[in-house]
């Protein structure tokens, strides 16, 4: 597979005659694994519409990074055609090296202090009613980037008061007080992905700790029960069904509201192999099980991704909570948090 060049930062864009900087130098020693042909149920239309191009132009004009591009999301054509984009703050270089992820690994640059305003400007230009903001892991920062998340949320609120904000955060491992800073900024949805079952963490997500991530999501609810919490996993990495069901129980013990389950797709030959393409009927079975365990909302399809249909899902989340609790308890919770 061709090395993908960084085309997002005008100041660091490689020259045509310069050697490409490897995205994943830490994976160079790994043996190649064959990339399997995708089954028919995972085919998507290539992007290229006028609205897709307009969204790309706005992203470029504000010198922003999107996880849609960096992670090689298969839904980019559909989402950008709807002028939906998931902004990835704090640069395009991650301090961790998860075996499933296509985001560049290395030593990140200093934070762009103007980035929160740039994101807010792009949100306003795109006319987004709901925006998703994620980030690379920044273990090099004292607070893991918590203050940068907080400033970005605040900037969006100022520029687009009617826009709801969903964040997809790293785990802030060994960053005391970081989570509290982010929650105090009052995002509407707090998403932190578990990514896989605990038995696969050593090979899939080696820099993270499974129960730390569960506790992170639980702590969000303790700090502010009005914030919706969300988490997602990939399947097809060699997990067993009983492991996925146990993960559901762990997330429900943390009062997580929304679960997403999607098929893992291998970015390059150096990444973790796809052990299995899970058929659609098994995703439907996972969805049924998750609803039975009490999640307010479940999205489980081969092409499900954390930010896919996020705006529509937020409306469904609100409706589901209202139907479950009724208007009086919801209003009381909001008053208690704001007191």
UniProtKB/Swiss-Prot annotation:
Ranges where the record places region Disordered: 13-35
Chain positions recorded as [4Fe-4S] cluster 1 binding sites: 68, 73, 79, 307
Pathway info: Protein modification; protein lipoylation via endogenous pathway; protein N(6)-(lipoyl)lysine from octanoyl-[acyl-carrier-protein]: step 2/2
GO cellular component: cytoplasm
Record SUPFAM superfamilies: Radical SAM enzymes
Radical SAM core domain boundaries: 80-296
Pfam families linked: Radical_SAM
Gene Ontology molecular-function annotations: 4 iron, 4 sulfur cluster binding; lipoate synthase activity; metal ion binding
EC identifiers of the protein: 2.8.1.8
Compartment(s) where it occurs, according to its Swiss-Prot or TrEMBL record: Cytoplasm
Domain of life: Bacteria
Cofactor note: Binds 2 [4Fe-4S] clusters per subunit. One cluster is coordinated with 3 cysteines and an exchangeable S-adenosyl-L-methionine.
Binding site for [4Fe-4S] cluster 2: 94, 98, 101
Listed InterPro entries: Aldolase_TIM (IPR013785), Elp3/MiaA/NifB-like_rSAM (IPR006638), Lipoyl_synth (IPR003698), rSAM (IPR007197)
Keywords, alphabetical: 4Fe-4S, Cytoplasm, Iron, Iron-sulfur, Metal-binding, S-adenosyl-L-methionine, Transferase
Cofactors required: [4Fe-4S] cluster
Catalyzed reaction equations: [[Fe-S] cluster scaffold protein carrying a second [4Fe-4S](2+) cluster] + N(6)-octanoyl-L-lysyl-[protein] + 2 oxidized [2Fe-2S]-[ferredoxin] + 2 S-adenosyl-L-methionine + 4 H(+) = [[Fe-S] cluster scaffold protein] + N(6)-[(R)-dihydrolipoyl]-L-lysyl-[protein] + 4 Fe(3+) + 2 hydrogen sulfide + 2 5'-deoxyadenosine + 2 L-methionine + 2 reduced [2Fe-2S]-[ferredoxin]
NCBIfam families: lipA (TIGR00510), PRK05481.1 (NF004019), PRK12928.1 (NF009544)
Family affiliation: Belongs to the radical SAM superfamily. Lipoyl synthase family.
Protein name per its UniProtKB record: Lipoyl synthase
Organism: Methylorubrum extorquens (strain CM4 / NCIMB 13688)
Underlying gene: lipA
